[in-house]
């Protein structure tokens, strides 16, 4: 192993000089071996500047780092623990435990920079993944081994939706999950850990956190650390769920690193390599003939603008998009999923079946018609509408309310127990509303219930 010395430190960017014959490769991990507070700090090589000097990004705080400190080349990229030992543990970007529960005790380590599976290895079968959340199962169904994006501005419920998905899927499908917290709030990471512990699924989840307060290098690489752990489970023949909260912070960390490295920014100040960086991550999240990775990614939408380069680049990689709307959230309807804006490649009669497809289409048509009639109602009132339109409005309002649902993870705040609704019950309920079976039931009865039977029961009680 070659050793070098630190020649320049600018925040998270550290330049290290090595002998000309032993210059580290790009993405190699370097370790600070000199004395002081930074002993053990890991640096990742980003550029070779010539003359034996490499430019690196620090994977931790560079406080106390000074010129002349000795640095050792590890000879490979950052390697993290993988396999069963990671389940139930919280780790940082380097795979070091941060939950004070002793060493990980892993049997194997993988480097975080790996090639995506080749075309021949990839699987092409389609199978639906039931989530138990009515609006998602109906309008934007998830595929096993697919990629799903949860789009939403600040405070419309991305994290709560993601927590509910983890809770439902871990309980109903008893699958393994990897949760990568990329640049999110430490409080949420803490809540998530205790929630998983309380619901008894902690031994099925591996958690990797690179929170908001950490340097950009950590936030940029933590998604790859989580993905590497998920890949190991997939290669063992398991079906894994990879949750990334939040993919926008991954882009943002890339922007910070890019600026620190002195690259010219592109549109809206993003890094010029935005599409390539996103592609490197997304292409690895795929299913092979051995096992599957189903990924759910929360995507923060800056200023609710879906045309911003970051969400727009993410859109291209996804099979299903769940768009959370501030307008729906303001009506008190949670989950605040917009059924007219959310899409899924799986919503095809050949995949979901003709009945499901027709009901989903019917729901969207009724809601779209109601949206068009809203202006007329606002100006002239309900009385000016034809009988058919009055019927459409009445059913649309019932559908809107029936799309809401109490969540298990929100029980603490709402006091109402969470509901898991099987897909067949979801289809039966919406089909009944569309066909006028429940025209006699008041719309309030459909608010915050599980299956349609609960709505009827609620109405009868009144």
Curated annotation (Swiss-Prot):
Domain of life: Bacteria
Keyword ATP-binding attached: yes
Main location (coarse class): membrane
Keywords: ATP synthesis, ATP-binding, Cell inner membrane, Cell membrane, CF(1), Hydrogen ion transport, Ion transport, Membrane, Nucleotide-binding, Translocase, Transport
Gene Ontology molecular function terms on file: ATP binding; ATP hydrolysis activity; proton-transporting ATP synthase activity, rotational mechanism
InterPro entries: AAA+_ATPase, ATP-synt_VA_C, ATP_synth_F1_bsu, ATPase_a/bsu_AS, ATPase_alpha/beta_chains, ATPase_F1/V1/A1_a/bsu_N, ATPase_F1/V1/A1_a/bsu_N_sf, ATPase_F1/V1/A1_a/bsu_nucl-bd
Topology term for the membrane: Peripheral membrane protein
CC terms in the record's Gene Ontology section: plasma membrane; proton-transporting ATP synthase complex
Complex formation: F-type ATPases have 2 components, CF(1) - the catalytic core - and CF(0) - the membrane proton channel. CF(1) has five subunits: alpha(3), beta(3), gamma(1), delta(1), epsilon(1). CF(0) has three main subunits: a(1), b(2) and c(9-12). The alpha and beta chains form an alternating ring which encloses part of the gamma chain. CF(1) is attached to CF(0) by a central stalk formed by the gamma and epsilon chains, while a peripheral stalk is formed by the delta and b chains.
Protein's recorded name: ATP synthase subunit beta
